[in-house]
Amino acid sequence: MQLPLKNLCFALLACLVLAGCKSSKTASEAGGTSPAAAESSRVVAANAAFIGKMNEQKVSAKAVTAKLKANLAGGGNSISANGTLKMKRGEAVQIAFSKFGIEVIRLEIDPDSVTIINRLEKYYVRTELRNNPLLGKLDIDFHLIESLFWGEFYMPQGLDARACAERVIASESGKAIKLFMNLGSTLSVETLANAEKALPESARLLNAAGQNAAIAFGYEERVPFAGGFFPSKMNLAAQNGKESFTINMELSKITEDAKWPSHTQLSGKYKRKKAESLLKLIP
């Protein structure tokens, strides 16, 4: 079980902790000119209306708990696992993977840190979310990460639909609309949304140079939930050099249960390891 466990750990690292980013794309390929130069007031108004329509599809729930079935593949190996996905808006994203009914790995993301807990070997790794040595100096925001898991269009805190529309570059892509938003000196996000339903179909994180920033989310299916539409099937894909890693998750028994701790309490039996030690898990 050791080799699959290493692949599981690295898939979590690559796909969820956003480690590594190597791509040859250029900024012009990813986004084009700045929104201020390219968008007219009429187009900005249309983009604001579309973003507003996407917001209307968001679920109203403040918390989500779901069972999951996952398949993780990378480094020439794959492993299937069951588990749970738990989220509280503004507080936590938790994913626990189990094998034979025993929890093996837990990933916990909160506004300040990322924690990976290895239940079998009794150790954990905790790093800061920002200024993380494993994030390739990408300025990752917790609210961006949770928007990906909730399957929602990311809106920086404090910005309404109009303000976001002034920052995006929108273009048609078949029956979808592509929205590119620069988030600062190190990061941008590209969302592909169904033009008719106004629901995100995928989202990619890019660095400021327009390069793939190690992660892409895809939303294959959604179900009515809490006044909106929540992803019931989603996939995460990551690229680290020549290796690609994927996590496909199918969710069931989705509820608004919030009766669980936002932070996992660990006993003294767990040893803390440095974040850099996870790089040794690369196949």
What are these regions (language model features)?
Residues 1-9:
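Bacterial N-terminal signal peptides that target proteins for export
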Residues 17-20:
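C-terminal motif of bacterial Sec signal peptides marking the signal peptidase cleavage site
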Residues 22-78, 275-283:
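N-terminal leader/targeting segments and the immediate start of mature chains
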Residues 23, 161-272, 276:
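Gly/Pro-enriched, hydrophobic low-complexity segments
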Residues 56-64, 75-79, 86-88, 107-109, ...:
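Edge/loop elements at the starts and ends of beta-strands within beta-rich repeat scaffolds
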Residues 74-78, 97-106, 186, 209-212, ...:
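Solvent-exposed loop/turn segments connecting transmembrane beta-strands
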Residues 92-143, 147:
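An acidic-aromatic
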Residues 129-130, 135-169, 279-280:
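C-terminal low-complexity, charged extensions that often adopt amphipathic alpha-helices
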